Amino acid sequence: MGFTDETVRFNLNDGDKDEISNTLTNVYRSLAEKGYNPINQIVGYVLSGDPAYVPRYNDARNQIRKYERDEIVEELVRYYLKGNGTDL
């Protein structure tokens, strides 16, 4: 399978955006409560796909695994750009 010069569209359902945001908040809190650095752990999970970066505490691991990592990245980028004044 090769790459193409054509731009591919990627779309995330609007309902999933809120659910992903809520999940990330819950996972962040669970990581913090267990004494981990939540940002480092979430980045580790997103980059590697290894669920061991997220504890089972408060069902955080199962919650974050409901979503594909590219969906999580899309929500993070959207949130960042919106928070920095980009009109989305």
Curated annotation (Swiss-Prot):
Pfam families according to UniProt: IreB
Source domain of life: Bacteria
InterPro entries registered for this protein in UniProt: IreB (IPR009309)
PANTHER family documented for this protein: UPF0297 PROTEIN YRZL
Family (UniProt): Belongs to the UPF0297 family.
Protein's recorded name: UPF0297 protein stu1959
Organism this protein belongs to: Streptococcus thermophilus (strain ATCC BAA-250 / LMG 18311)
